[in-house]
């Protein structure tokens, strides 16, 4: 019996088998969790239904996190099958493509700034607000961040600011929901080749650099992140809340390892 047996967890953000959310769902399924999934639009519906079926789930619901009404409708529908559940994984982030290339100050726009923060950060607390009364004591909410929240990463630009907002969101949500027995955490994952990452200029160079200088001398995988996510949504991590856990092979703690390559 896995360490998530008896847990019901909603997973957002599965777009392909390369998605971090897919790796998380795989690990949670392996550990016995009962899963539900969301999809953003009809283009993704069939694909997400297929992945859900492979992971033993028939609960696949539409949700556009840009619209509060869509979030509310999704949780109302989920409540018909799961009146109570044990948490959700927020693996959602977006910025317009023109924001992710070149000099940050030149590239950023008011609209791009607003959209990045709305979709990548506000949507996390919007989902928590909408399902707060449905969460069992001992529930865990998890989101995905990146080192660009802490450091200026070339071409990551306004997404770095949105991820910094998201990490602050984690702390404030953890403090607000803790008395109800709800924990809130984030994983700051190392770069992984996903559909979302493909929109960042020179992402392949970023991967190669990380592989060369990361202490473990490899990039992390969706399986690495999935295993950590399963732990953070389980009772094994009952004392952890408000944290940003780096699953990046140690990249964020090292400096100047490139000197050893010369």
UniProtKB/Swiss-Prot annotation:
Keywords: Antibiotic resistance, Biotin biosynthesis, Fatty acid biosynthesis, Fatty acid metabolism, Lipid biosynthesis, Lipid metabolism, NAD, Oxidoreductase
Family: Belongs to the short-chain dehydrogenases/reductases (SDR) family. FabI subfamily.
Disulphide connectivity of cysteines: none
Cross-referenced InterPro entries: Enoyl-ACP_Rdtase_NADH, NAD(P)-bd_dom_sf, SDR_fam
Protein name stated in the entry: Enoyl-[acyl-carrier-protein] reductase [NADH] FabI
Source species of the chain: Salmonella typhimurium (strain LT2 / SGSC1412 / ATCC 700720)
Residues marked Involved in acyl-ACP binding (site): 201, 204-205
Protein residues bound to NAD(+): 13, 19-20, 40, 64-65, 92, 163, 192-196
Primary role: Catalyzes the reduction of a carbon-carbon double bond in an enoyl moiety that is covalently linked to an acyl carrier protein (ACP). Involved in the elongation cycle of fatty acid which are used in the lipid metabolism and in the biotin biosynthesis.
Keyword Ion transport: no
Transmembrane segments: none
Ligand binding (substrate): 95
Pfam families attached to this UniProt entry: adh_short_C2 (PF13561)
Assembly with partners or alone: Homotetramer.
CDD domains: ENR_SDR
Enzyme Commission number(s) from the entry: 1.3.1.9
Keyword ATP-binding: no
Biological processes per GO annotation: biotin biosynthetic process; fatty acid elongation; response to antibiotic
Any GO MF annotation of the entry: enoyl-[acyl-carrier-protein] reductase (NADH) activity
Active site as annotated: 146 (proton acceptor), 156 (proton acceptor)
């Amino acid at each position: 019996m896995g360490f998530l047996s008896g847990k019901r967890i909603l997973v957002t953000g599965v777009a392909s088998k390369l998605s971090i959310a897919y790796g998380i769902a795989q690990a949670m399924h392996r550990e016995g969790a009962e899963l539900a999934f969301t999809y953003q639009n009809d283009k993704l519906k069939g694909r997400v239904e297929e992945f859900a079926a492979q992971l033993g789930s028939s609960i696949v619901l539409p949700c556009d996190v840009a619209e509060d009404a869509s979030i509310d409708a999704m949780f109302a529908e989920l409540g018909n099958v799961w009146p109570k559940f044990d948490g959700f994984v927020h693996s959602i982030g977006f910025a317009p493509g023109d924001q992710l290339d070149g000099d940050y100050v030149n590239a950023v726009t008011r609209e791009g700034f607003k959209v990045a923060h709305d979709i990548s950060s506000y949507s996390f607390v919007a989902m928590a607000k909408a399902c707060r009364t449905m969460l069992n004591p001992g529930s865990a909410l998890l989101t995905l961040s990146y080192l660009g929240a802490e450091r200026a990463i070339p071409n990551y630009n306004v997404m770095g600011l949105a991820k910094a907002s998201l990490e602050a969101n984690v702390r404030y949500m953890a403090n607000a929901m803790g008395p109800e027995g709800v924990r809130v955490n984030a994983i700051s994952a190392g770069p992984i080749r996903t559909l979302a990452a493909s929109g960042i200029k020179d992402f392949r160079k970023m991967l190669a650099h990380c592989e060369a200088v990361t202490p473990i001398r490899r990039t992390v995988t969706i399986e690495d992140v999935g295993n950590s996510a399963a732990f953070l949504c389980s009772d094994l991590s009952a004392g952890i809340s408000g944290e940003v856990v780096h699953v990046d092979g140690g990249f964020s703690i090292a400096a100047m390892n490139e000197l050893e390559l010369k």
